[in-house]
Amino acid sequence: MNKVVLLCRPGFEKECAAEITDKAGQREIFGFARVKENAGYVIYECYQPDDGDKLIRELPFSSLIFARQWFVVGELLQHLPPEDRITPIVGMLQGVVEKGGELRVEVADTNESKELLKFCRKFTVPLRAVLRDAGGLANYETPKRPVVHVFFIAPGCCYTGYSYSNNNSPFYMGIPRLKFPADAPSRSTLKLEEAFHVFIPADEWDERLANGMWAVDLGACPGGWTYQLVKRNMWVYSVDNGPMAQSLMDTGQVTWLREDGFKFRPTRSNISWMVCDMVEKPAKVAALMAQWLVNGWCRETIFNLKLPMKKRYEEVSHNLAYIQAQLDEHGINAQIQARQLYHDREEVTVHVRRIWAAVGGRRDER
Protein backbone atom coordinates (compact mmCIF):
# COMPACT_ATOMS: atom_id res chain seq x y z
CA MET A 1 0.00 0.00 0.00
CA ASN A 2 2.03 2.90 -1.29
CA LYS A 3 -0.66 5.56 -1.76
CA VAL A 4 -1.86 8.17 0.74
CA VAL A 5 -5.24 9.86 0.19
CA LEU A 6 -5.47 13.40 1.59
CA LEU A 7 -8.89 15.07 1.81
CA CYS A 8 -8.89 18.86 1.36
CA ARG A 9 -11.09 21.82 0.51
CA PRO A 10 -12.16 21.69 -3.18
CA GLY A 11 -10.01 24.15 -5.12
CA PHE A 12 -6.98 23.70 -2.85
CA GLU A 13 -5.69 20.42 -4.31
CA LYS A 14 -2.49 22.05 -5.65
CA GLU A 15 -1.65 23.49 -2.24
CA CYS A 16 -2.33 20.17 -0.54
CA ALA A 17 -0.14 18.38 -3.11
CA ALA A 18 2.70 20.91 -2.79
CA GLU A 19 2.64 20.58 0.98
CA ILE A 20 2.65 16.77 1.19
CA THR A 21 5.38 16.55 -1.49
CA ASP A 22 7.50 19.03 0.48
CA LYS A 23 6.98 17.48 3.93
CA ALA A 24 7.29 13.87 2.75
CA GLY A 25 10.51 14.81 0.93
CA GLN A 26 11.93 16.31 4.14
CA ARG A 27 11.55 12.82 5.67
CA GLU A 28 13.08 11.18 2.59
CA ILE A 29 9.77 9.61 1.59
CA PHE A 30 9.69 10.30 -2.13
CA GLY A 31 6.83 10.06 -4.57
CA PHE A 32 4.47 12.18 -6.66
CA ALA A 33 1.03 13.69 -6.17
CA ARG A 34 -1.95 12.95 -8.41
CA VAL A 35 -4.12 16.06 -8.58
CA LYS A 36 -7.55 16.55 -10.11
CA GLU A 37 -8.91 20.09 -9.92
CA ASN A 38 -11.84 20.64 -7.53
CA ALA A 39 -11.90 16.93 -6.64
CA GLY A 40 -11.55 17.63 -2.90
CA TYR A 41 -8.72 15.12 -2.49
CA VAL A 42 -5.13 14.40 -3.52
CA ILE A 43 -3.36 11.04 -3.87
CA TYR A 44 0.33 10.97 -2.95
CA GLU A 45 1.91 7.89 -4.51
CA CYS A 46 5.16 6.78 -2.87
CA TYR A 47 7.93 5.12 -4.89
CA GLN A 48 8.63 2.51 -2.19
CA PRO A 49 5.86 -0.04 -1.38
CA ASP A 50 5.84 0.48 2.42
CA ASP A 51 6.34 4.24 2.43
CA GLY A 52 2.61 5.04 2.56
CA ASP A 53 2.37 3.47 6.01
CA LYS A 54 5.67 5.05 7.05
CA LEU A 55 4.40 8.50 6.02
CA ILE A 56 1.13 8.38 8.01
CA ARG A 57 3.01 7.01 11.03
CA GLU A 58 6.00 9.34 11.10
CA LEU A 59 4.78 12.71 9.78
CA PRO A 60 2.59 14.38 12.43
CA PHE A 61 -0.86 14.98 10.95
CA SER A 62 -1.04 18.17 13.05
CA SER A 63 1.83 19.60 10.97
CA LEU A 64 -0.30 19.61 7.79
CA ILE A 65 -2.11 22.81 6.83
CA PHE A 66 -4.26 21.92 3.82
CA ALA A 67 -5.23 18.30 4.60
CA ARG A 68 -8.46 17.62 6.51
CA GLN A 69 -7.83 13.89 6.78
CA TRP A 70 -5.42 11.27 5.46
CA PHE A 71 -5.17 7.50 5.17
CA VAL A 72 -3.03 4.93 3.35
CA VAL A 73 -4.73 2.90 0.58
CA GLY A 74 -4.07 0.16 -1.99
CA GLU A 75 -5.22 -0.01 -5.61
CA LEU A 76 -8.55 1.46 -6.72
CA LEU A 77 -11.47 -0.97 -6.60
CA GLN A 78 -13.59 -0.43 -9.73
CA HIS A 79 -16.88 -1.77 -11.12
CA LEU A 80 -18.10 -3.11 -7.78
CA PRO A 81 -21.13 -5.34 -8.55
CA PRO A 82 -24.32 -3.63 -7.25
CA GLU A 83 -25.61 -6.96 -5.92
CA ASP A 84 -22.49 -7.49 -3.74
CA ARG A 85 -20.17 -4.54 -3.14
CA ILE A 86 -19.11 -5.81 0.28
CA THR A 87 -17.14 -8.98 -0.63
CA PRO A 88 -14.48 -7.23 -2.82
CA ILE A 89 -14.01 -4.50 -0.17
CA VAL A 90 -13.57 -7.02 2.66
CA GLY A 91 -11.19 -8.99 0.43
CA MET A 92 -9.02 -5.90 -0.16
CA LEU A 93 -8.81 -5.21 3.57
CA GLN A 94 -7.95 -8.76 4.66
CA GLY A 95 -4.38 -9.01 5.85
CA VAL A 96 -4.06 -5.21 5.71
CA VAL A 97 -5.73 -4.23 8.97
CA GLU A 98 -6.93 -6.43 11.82
CA LYS A 99 -9.35 -5.51 14.60
CA GLY A 100 -9.79 -1.92 13.44
CA GLY A 101 -11.32 0.39 16.03
CA GLU A 102 -13.76 2.25 13.75
CA LEU A 103 -15.13 2.17 10.19
CA ARG A 104 -15.56 5.34 8.13
CA VAL A 105 -17.15 5.12 4.68
CA GLU A 106 -16.46 8.55 3.18
CA VAL A 107 -16.48 10.74 0.08
CA ALA A 108 -14.80 14.02 -0.88
CA ASP A 109 -16.54 17.22 0.22
CA THR A 110 -17.97 18.22 -3.20
CA ASN A 111 -21.48 18.95 -4.50
CA GLU A 112 -21.19 15.96 -6.85
CA SER A 113 -20.57 13.62 -3.90
CA LYS A 114 -23.70 14.55 -1.92
CA GLU A 115 -25.82 11.73 -3.38
CA LEU A 116 -22.95 9.30 -2.89
CA LEU A 117 -22.70 10.38 0.75
CA LYS A 118 -26.28 9.20 1.38
CA PHE A 119 -25.32 5.78 0.01
CA CYS A 120 -22.17 5.69 2.19
CA ARG A 121 -24.20 6.23 5.35
CA LYS A 122 -26.58 3.37 4.49
CA PHE A 123 -23.75 1.11 3.32
CA THR A 124 -21.73 1.53 6.55
CA VAL A 125 -24.01 -0.67 8.71
CA PRO A 126 -23.93 -3.90 6.63
CA LEU A 127 -20.24 -3.43 5.78
CA ARG A 128 -19.38 -2.99 9.46
CA ALA A 129 -21.17 -6.24 10.36
CA VAL A 130 -19.32 -8.29 7.72
CA LEU A 131 -15.95 -6.71 8.57
CA ARG A 132 -16.43 -7.63 12.23
CA ASP A 133 -17.19 -11.24 11.28
CA ALA A 134 -14.08 -11.31 9.07
CA GLY A 135 -11.83 -9.88 11.82
CA GLY A 136 -11.16 -6.59 10.04
CA LEU A 137 -12.97 -4.66 12.79
CA ALA A 138 -13.07 -5.17 16.55
CA ASN A 139 -16.47 -6.09 18.01
CA TYR A 140 -16.74 -2.63 19.56
CA GLU A 141 -15.47 0.83 18.61
CA THR A 142 -12.18 1.77 20.26
CA PRO A 143 -9.88 4.78 19.75
CA LYS A 144 -6.85 2.59 20.50
CA ARG A 145 -6.94 0.73 17.15
CA PRO A 146 -6.49 1.96 13.54
CA VAL A 147 -9.45 3.51 11.71
CA VAL A 148 -10.62 1.57 8.62
CA HIS A 149 -11.41 3.89 5.68
CA VAL A 150 -13.49 3.11 2.59
CA PHE A 151 -13.33 6.13 0.27
CA PHE A 152 -15.77 6.29 -2.65
CA ILE A 153 -14.76 8.53 -5.56
CA ALA A 154 -17.72 7.46 -7.75
CA PRO A 155 -20.56 4.91 -7.56
CA GLY A 156 -19.01 1.43 -7.51
CA CYS A 157 -15.49 2.91 -7.28
CA CYS A 158 -13.53 3.12 -4.01
CA TYR A 159 -10.18 3.02 -2.24
CA THR A 160 -9.77 1.00 0.97
CA GLY A 161 -7.19 1.53 3.68
CA TYR A 162 -6.55 2.79 7.19
CA SER A 163 -5.23 5.62 9.35
CA TYR A 164 -3.76 5.63 12.85
CA SER A 165 -6.13 7.00 15.49
CA ASN A 166 -3.29 8.84 17.25
CA ASN A 167 -2.22 10.62 14.04
CA ASN A 168 -5.35 11.53 12.06
CA SER A 169 -8.42 13.73 12.30
CA PRO A 170 -10.95 12.35 14.79
CA PHE A 171 -13.79 13.72 12.64
CA TYR A 172 -15.71 11.94 9.87
CA MET A 173 -14.34 13.28 6.53
CA GLY A 174 -12.11 15.49 8.69
CA ILE A 175 -15.01 17.89 9.29
CA PRO A 176 -16.28 18.81 12.79
CA ARG A 177 -20.08 19.01 12.74
CA LEU A 178 -20.88 22.36 14.36
CA LYS A 179 -24.23 24.08 14.64
CA PHE A 180 -24.49 27.84 14.08
CA PRO A 181 -25.73 29.44 17.33
CA ALA A 182 -28.88 31.48 16.65
CA ASP A 183 -27.74 34.34 18.91
CA ALA A 184 -24.24 34.72 17.37
CA PRO A 185 -23.60 38.04 15.55
CA SER A 186 -22.02 36.43 12.45
CA ARG A 187 -21.24 33.05 10.89
CA SER A 188 -17.52 33.68 11.42
CA THR A 189 -18.09 32.47 14.99
CA LEU A 190 -17.88 28.90 13.67
CA LYS A 191 -14.26 29.47 12.55
CA LEU A 192 -13.09 30.10 16.10
CA GLU A 193 -15.21 27.28 17.54
CA GLU A 194 -13.76 24.85 15.00
CA ALA A 195 -10.24 26.14 15.76
CA PHE A 196 -10.75 25.31 19.45
CA HIS A 197 -11.80 21.76 18.47
CA VAL A 198 -8.86 21.28 16.09
CA PHE A 199 -6.04 22.89 18.08
CA ILE A 200 -6.93 22.29 21.74
CA PRO A 201 -7.44 18.76 23.12
CA ALA A 202 -10.92 18.35 24.63
CA ASP A 203 -9.51 17.40 28.04
CA GLU A 204 -7.60 20.73 28.21
CA TRP A 205 -10.54 23.05 27.47
CA ASP A 206 -11.40 23.67 31.13
CA GLU A 207 -7.82 24.71 31.85
CA ARG A 208 -6.93 26.65 28.69
CA LEU A 209 -10.38 28.13 27.89
CA ALA A 210 -11.28 28.81 31.50
CA ASN A 211 -13.91 30.95 33.20
CA GLY A 212 -12.68 34.41 34.12
CA MET A 213 -9.75 34.58 31.69
CA TRP A 214 -8.95 37.88 29.98
CA ALA A 215 -8.94 37.96 26.18
CA VAL A 216 -8.48 40.45 23.33
CA ASP A 217 -10.27 40.29 19.96
CA LEU A 218 -8.55 42.42 17.30
CA GLY A 219 -10.82 43.47 14.43
CA ALA A 220 -13.80 42.26 16.43
CA CYS A 221 -16.84 43.87 14.71
CA PRO A 222 -19.62 42.67 14.83
CA GLY A 223 -18.43 40.09 17.37
CA GLY A 224 -18.48 36.59 15.88
CA TRP A 225 -15.19 35.64 17.56
CA THR A 226 -15.90 37.63 20.73
CA TYR A 227 -19.10 35.56 21.05
CA GLN A 228 -17.07 32.34 21.49
CA LEU A 229 -14.93 33.93 24.21
CA VAL A 230 -17.98 35.30 26.03
CA LYS A 231 -19.61 31.85 25.79
CA ARG A 232 -16.57 30.48 27.66
CA ASN A 233 -17.19 33.15 30.36
CA MET A 234 -14.11 35.23 29.56
CA TRP A 235 -13.69 38.99 29.94
CA VAL A 236 -13.03 40.43 26.48
CA TYR A 237 -11.50 43.62 25.09
CA SER A 238 -13.05 43.90 21.61
CA VAL A 239 -10.95 46.22 19.46
CA ASP A 240 -12.52 47.66 16.29
CA ASN A 241 -13.65 50.98 14.85
CA GLY A 242 -16.91 49.26 13.88
CA PRO A 243 -19.66 48.66 16.47
CA MET A 244 -20.18 45.44 18.42
CA ALA A 245 -23.47 43.54 18.57
CA GLN A 246 -25.64 44.90 21.38
CA SER A 247 -26.36 41.37 22.62
CA LEU A 248 -22.65 40.97 23.46
CA MET A 249 -22.40 44.37 25.13
CA ASP A 250 -25.41 43.48 27.28
CA THR A 251 -23.50 40.57 28.87
CA GLY A 252 -21.27 43.00 30.76
CA GLN A 253 -18.24 40.87 29.80
CA VAL A 254 -17.19 42.95 26.77
CA THR A 255 -15.26 46.23 26.71
CA TRP A 256 -15.47 47.81 23.25
CA LEU A 257 -12.32 49.80 22.39
CA ARG A 258 -12.92 51.93 19.32
CA GLU A 259 -9.47 51.88 17.74
CA ASP A 260 -7.31 50.25 15.07
CA GLY A 261 -6.35 46.66 15.90
CA PHE A 262 -2.84 47.24 14.51
CA LYS A 263 -2.22 50.20 16.85
CA PHE A 264 -3.83 48.82 20.01
CA ARG A 265 -1.47 47.99 22.88
CA PRO A 266 -2.82 46.13 25.93
CA THR A 267 -2.51 47.66 29.39
CA ARG A 268 -3.18 44.43 31.31
CA SER A 269 -0.40 41.89 31.90
CA ASN A 270 -2.64 38.84 32.41
CA ILE A 271 -4.18 38.36 28.96
CA SER A 272 -4.51 34.65 28.22
CA TRP A 273 -5.95 34.83 24.69
CA MET A 274 -5.67 37.13 21.70
CA VAL A 275 -7.74 36.32 18.62
CA CYS A 276 -7.70 38.12 15.29
CA ASP A 277 -9.65 37.82 12.03
CA MET A 278 -8.75 40.95 10.08
CA VAL A 279 -8.88 41.32 6.28
CA GLU A 280 -5.29 42.39 5.69
CA LYS A 281 -2.15 41.20 3.91
CA PRO A 282 -0.88 38.03 5.61
CA ALA A 283 2.64 39.43 6.12
CA LYS A 284 1.24 42.42 8.02
CA VAL A 285 -0.90 40.20 10.25
CA ALA A 286 2.03 37.81 10.87
CA ALA A 287 4.24 40.73 11.95
CA LEU A 288 1.57 41.93 14.41
CA MET A 289 1.09 38.43 15.84
CA ALA A 290 4.85 38.01 16.28
CA GLN A 291 4.96 41.33 18.14
CA TRP A 292 2.25 40.21 20.57
CA LEU A 293 3.96 36.89 21.22
CA VAL A 294 7.50 38.27 21.58
CA ASN A 295 6.32 40.94 24.03
CA GLY A 296 4.36 38.40 26.07
CA TRP A 297 1.13 40.36 25.63
CA CYS A 298 -0.82 37.08 25.44
CA ARG A 299 -0.29 33.43 26.28
CA GLU A 300 -2.09 31.89 23.28
CA THR A 301 -3.40 33.26 20.01
CA ILE A 302 -5.61 32.12 17.16
CA PHE A 303 -5.60 34.24 14.01
CA ASN A 304 -6.42 34.03 10.32
CA LEU A 305 -4.07 34.64 7.41
CA LYS A 306 -5.87 35.61 4.19
CA LEU A 307 -4.42 33.80 1.18
CA PRO A 308 -3.25 35.34 -2.11
CA MET A 309 -4.52 34.00 -5.44
CA LYS A 310 -1.23 32.23 -6.28
CA LYS A 311 1.55 30.42 -4.39
CA ARG A 312 -0.65 30.02 -1.33
CA TYR A 313 1.38 27.26 0.31
CA GLU A 314 4.60 29.23 -0.17
CA GLU A 315 3.01 32.38 1.29
CA VAL A 316 1.71 30.61 4.39
CA SER A 317 5.01 28.77 4.90
CA HIS A 318 6.92 32.06 4.62
CA ASN A 319 4.70 33.78 7.22
CA LEU A 320 4.88 30.88 9.68
CA ALA A 321 8.67 30.75 9.26
CA TYR A 322 8.83 34.50 9.99
CA ILE A 323 6.88 34.08 13.25
CA GLN A 324 9.07 31.10 14.25
CA ALA A 325 12.24 33.10 13.53
CA GLN A 326 11.03 36.01 15.68
CA LEU A 327 10.24 33.66 18.57
CA ASP A 328 13.62 31.90 18.24
CA GLU A 329 15.47 35.21 18.15
CA HIS A 330 13.91 36.22 21.49
CA GLY A 331 14.39 32.84 23.16
CA ILE A 332 10.69 32.00 23.30
CA ASN A 333 9.54 28.40 23.10
CA ALA A 334 6.16 28.03 21.41
CA GLN A 335 3.97 25.56 19.58
CA ILE A 336 2.75 26.67 16.14
CA GLN A 337 -0.02 24.91 14.24
CA ALA A 338 -1.93 25.97 11.13
CA ARG A 339 -4.90 24.47 9.32
CA GLN A 340 -7.31 25.44 6.60
CA LEU A 341 -10.48 24.77 8.56
CA TYR A 342 -13.78 23.61 7.11
CA HIS A 343 -15.30 27.03 7.88
CA ASP A 344 -12.33 28.90 6.35
CA ARG A 345 -12.51 30.07 2.76
CA GLU A 346 -9.50 31.77 1.11
CA GLU A 347 -7.57 31.70 4.40
CA VAL A 348 -5.83 29.51 6.96
CA THR A 349 -6.16 29.61 10.73
CA VAL A 350 -3.05 29.63 12.91
CA HIS A 351 -2.68 28.76 16.60
CA VAL A 352 0.41 29.71 18.61
CA ARG A 353 0.94 28.83 22.26
CA ARG A 354 3.81 30.28 24.27
CA ILE A 355 5.29 27.56 26.50
CA TRP A 356 8.11 29.36 28.31
CA ALA A 357 10.69 32.04 27.75
CA ALA A 358 14.43 31.37 28.00
CA VAL A 359 14.85 34.90 29.29
CA GLY A 360 12.94 36.49 32.16
CA GLY A 361 9.37 37.11 31.17
CA ARG A 362 5.90 36.27 32.35
CA ARG A 363 5.91 34.49 35.70
CA ASP A 364 3.49 31.79 34.54
CA GLU A 365 5.96 30.74 31.83
CA ARG A 366 9.11 30.30 33.93
From Swiss-Prot:
GO cellular component: cytoplasm
Example GO biological process: methylation
Top-level lineage group: Bacteria
GO molecular function: S-adenosylmethionine-dependent methyltransferase activity
Main location group: cytoplasm
The protein's Enzyme Commission number: 2.1.1.186
Keywords, alphabetical: Cytoplasm, Methyltransferase, rRNA processing, S-adenosyl-L-methionine, Transferase
Binding site for S-adenosyl-L-methionine: S188, C221, P222, G223, G224, D240, D260, D277
Catalyzed reactions: cytidine(2498) in 23S rRNA + S-adenosyl-L-methionine = 2'-O-methylcytidine(2498) in 23S rRNA + S-adenosyl-L-homocysteine + H(+)
Pfam family, one: RlmM_FDX
Active site: K306 (proton acceptor)
Localization in the cell: Cytoplasm
Quaternary structure (record): Monomer.
HAMAP family: 23SrRNA_methyltr_M
Family, as annotated: Belongs to the class I-like SAM-binding methyltransferase superfamily. RNA methyltransferase RlmE family. RlmM subfamily.
Purpose of the protein: Catalyzes the 2'-O-methylation at nucleotide C2498 in 23S rRNA.
Identification of the protein by name: Ribosomal RNA large subunit methyltransferase M
Organism: Shigella dysenteriae serotype 1 (strain Sd197)
